[in-house]
């Protein structure tokens, strides 16, 4: 287990009001169905990193816990986007803690242009995740890491650097390769690198619009989900709580993302992560590379790949028929980890 003292002083506090943290009206709720809103029993907390940065997190305990998990989202995402998923995980016996990355959700942001993505220091993100997890009470059950997209890439970095912190990991469409559309990947990397060193790192990439110009998505045009309600969750929260908003990628952010995926995609890097991993790969993907998922699944020593050919980028937000297949795989995977901890033989279908 990681010794948190290696990072310096940090602290973990609860409870607090998310809306109060964001300086907004706690009674102003987004126009979303009740299952997408804060679940009963949910508690907010604050984690203070050794450098003083405050990261917001939330906790939903399970009535009869058989495992615990730390959930981290992808680029631009916030805890609120995962309320339904958090509720479903808790109903399955997982005590859930969900963390906002720096610069996203209710965690600390730069004062100037707080919605603008900076060039991310992904090593620091991995440190934040490790420090936060090490500050939690020692687990009596298996501890899992659940991560989506950018969060999945940071998760792999954390798992490689801090072995023993988690017993297993569940990765949803992890950012192991970045789709660049009609622009060849090498050209895109060259452009972002040149823009960064030219002082244009905070400029939005071509075709990206600031959030205020975004309209409510439909399942036909949404790039993350084909579900008519779940595809609007983030828009609902962003339109109601301005403090949660994040703009699209900048040259600086994308340049650092390219560097990260090059690092974590190396065979020797992946070979050093030996805990059980369940990896979901979406078939209708516009953000990350499914081929990179297949390659990683071959190189990781203990990885099960779940391909969802009819899913867009976010399996946790997809239509029930797709989402249920993903949760079926999660149920079986969690049961394996619980059985392994208890020393009971478990049938693997």
Please name every model-derived segment:
Residues 1-48, 55-60:
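An N-terminal hydrophobic leader/cap segment in hydrolases
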Residues 79, 86-112:
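Conserved alpha/beta-hydrolase
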Residues 117-137:
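Alpha/beta-hydrolase active-site loop
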Residues 155-242:
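Alpha/beta-hydrolase-fold enzymes
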Residues 266, 275, 289-298:
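Short alpha-helix in the alpha/beta-hydrolase fold that links the catalytic acid
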Residues 273, 279-281:
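Short beta-strand/loop motif that positions the catalytic acidic residue
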Residues 284-288:
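Acidic catalytic loop of the alpha/beta-hydrolase fold
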Residues 304, 309-349:
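Catalytic active-site module of serine/aspartate enzymes centered on a nucleophile-bearing elbow/loop
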